[in-house]
UniProtKB/Swiss-Prot annotation:
Gene Ontology CC terms, in alphabetical order: chloroplast; mitochondrial large ribosomal subunit
Quaternary structure note: Part of the 50S ribosomal subunit.
Compartments reported by the entry: Plastid, Chloroplast
HAMAP family on file: Ribosomal_uL16
Keyword Phosphoprotein in record: no
Protein name per UniProt: Large ribosomal subunit protein uL16c
Lineage, top ranks: Eukaryota, Sar, Rhizaria, Cercozoa, Chlorarachniophyceae
Keyword annotations: Chloroplast, Plastid, Ribonucleoprotein, Ribosomal protein
Alphabetized Pfam families for the sequence: Ribosomal_L16 (PF00252)
Family label: Belongs to the universal ribosomal protein uL16 family.
GO molecular function annotations of the record: rRNA binding; structural constituent of ribosome
Naturally occurring in which organism (per UniProt): Bigelowiella natans (Pedinomonas minutissima)
Biological processes annotated in GO: mitochondrial translation
Amino acid sequence: MLSPKRTKFRRYHRIRSKGTANCSNTIVFGEFGIQALTCSWITSRQIEAGRRAITRYVKRGGKLWIRIFPDKPITFRPPETRMGSGKGAPELWVSVVRSGNMLYEILGVSEVTARGAMRIASYKLPVKTKFIKKVKN
């Protein structure tokens, strides 16, 4: 699973993700990609599940870029714990995704293959997505 090697703080606030993405909202590396249409947290397990679905569908052809990284720790308290005694321990890592963020990009496969791979990967994610093709200038 993806997680940062080190962070400045162990615990962070749970910010609300709303609005549109100002950066990483266009295709930069690949030729095809999927873009988020809604806001959500995407966990490292969901990112990995999407990556596996894409690589298995294209049968190790092409190059894949993951444009999001889970850099935010989410903490949970143990069940039936009394109030107080601080914040819980970090349990999972999430990436804050806003509408317009590019999630995955792929290069070196046909459009039909890329569309099928991205469709399967989108089923693994908690956001609505759309398939994007790079505009040739």
